[in-house]
């Protein structure tokens, strides 16, 4: 993608507005209709749109309404809008991050940020980063996880098999599992994946179908993906590519292959899913894929099975219609505590020894909770701060 974008930006034969719409079409083709290009021009970041009888492209009006800024035309003296004289809106570069945070907070848009470098007349432009709901690293406003998930769906005689992987880009945690349905319950794998996405808050999904005969609409509706940002992937990485990718990303030095080193040789759908996911994130921002934790298998055998969408039906997690149990009982003092509370409620263990250990620990600390809470209230989100330090993305004010 970056090479294609740079090739368009280097073409000086076209007007900049025409180049902008070529970029917009390229982004929409790759990421869907909610893609938008924000381009730095002088001291402003601008967004363009054409809306006439012949063509409709761009999101200037939509973004202007969201940010409550004035919509105009490139040349106000010409009433008609076109690619040469588009509808436009812009924000000052000095306040760009504030407005970008507002766009990202919608949990809807995939934003391509094109920046400029150099001084006139030797100004050039480049794709800085692509920010989407699942790859949002710098503008997270809540304390929940921010997972981007990849699913590879296959089927054998109508029985679904799913490779699942997820990355929380804000903490660097990485999860995977492979689930197979049964002849008694052909949708078991889809039910499990639906639970995973509720347990690990998922803002964006890349879904790939290994069998062209799969009813894609049935799967998308079953997993309620239309309520999230999702993309249907076509990239099917070969095993050699997967090994090389994992070796570089996880910095593996071993006589074993990278997949063997990660103990994932028995879950081919999961390794493919993880490779697709990492490749997708690199396409947005290659820096945030650095220093990931090793993939952790979701050991479902430790937990009570929650079928039939139990977490939603019991209002453990929040839905559009009802508040959640988590919200009701959340009196934690730190972001890490809130995430742990959610993990405990959505992953009920069945090991009696572990349950008794937790009870004993709670009883032991109960009389000291007030002074401990006062200290905890002053602790920042260490998991995310540590991740930002590792990636040298920590701001001084943090």
What spans do the regions from the language model cover?
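Short secondary-structure subsegments characteristic of cysteine-rich extracellular domains
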Residues: 391-398
């Amino acid at each position: 993608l970056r090479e294609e974008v740079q090739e368009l930006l280097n073409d000086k034969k076209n007007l900049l507005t025409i180049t902008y719409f070529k970029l917009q079409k390229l982004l929409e083709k790759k990421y869907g209709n909610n893609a938008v290009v924000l381009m730095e021009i002088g001291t402003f970041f601008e967004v363009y749109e054409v809306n006439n009888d012949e063509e409709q492209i761009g999101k200037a009006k939509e973004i202007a309404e969201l940010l409550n800024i004035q919509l105009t035309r490139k040349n106000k003296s010409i009433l008609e809008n076109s690619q040469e004289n588009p509808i436009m809106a812009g924000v000052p570069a000095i306040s760009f991050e504030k407005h970008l945070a507002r766009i990202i907070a919608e949990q809807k848009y995939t934003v391509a940020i094109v920046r400029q470098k150099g001084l006139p007349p030797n100004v050039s432009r480049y794709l800085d980063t692509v920010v989407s709901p699942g790859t949002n690293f710098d503008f997270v406003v809540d304390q929940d996880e921010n997972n981007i998930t990849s699913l590879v769906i296959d089927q054998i005689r109508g029985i679904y098999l799913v490779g699942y992987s997820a990355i929380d880009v804000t903490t660097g945690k990485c999860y995977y599992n492979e689930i197979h349905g049964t002849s008694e319950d052909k949708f078991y794998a889809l039910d499990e994946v639906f639970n995973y996405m509720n347990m690990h808050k998922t803002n964006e999904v890349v879904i790939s179908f290994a069998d062209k005969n799969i009813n894609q609409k049935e799967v998308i509706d079953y997993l309620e993906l239309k309520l999230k940002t999702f993309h249907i992937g076509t990239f099917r990485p070969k095993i050699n590519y997967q090994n090389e990718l994992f070796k570089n990303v996880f910095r593996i030095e071993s006589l074993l292959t990278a997949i063997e080193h990660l103990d994932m040789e028995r879950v081919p759908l999961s390794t493919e899913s993880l490779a697709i996911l990492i490749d997708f994130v690199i396409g947005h921002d290659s820096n945030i894929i650095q220093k990931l934790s090793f993939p952790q298998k979701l050991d479902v055998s430790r937990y009570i099975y929650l079928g039939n969408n139990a977490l939603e039906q019991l209002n453990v997690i929040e839905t559009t219609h009802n508040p959640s149990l988590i919200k009701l009982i959340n009196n934690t003092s730190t972001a890490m505590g809130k995430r742990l509370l959610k993990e405990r409620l959505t992953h009920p263990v069945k090991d009696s020894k572990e349950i008794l250990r937790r009870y004993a620990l709670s009883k032991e600390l109960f009389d000291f909770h007030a002074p401990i809470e006062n200290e905890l209230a002053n602790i920042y989100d260490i998991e995310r701060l540590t991740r930002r330090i590792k990636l040298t993305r920590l701001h001084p004010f943090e």
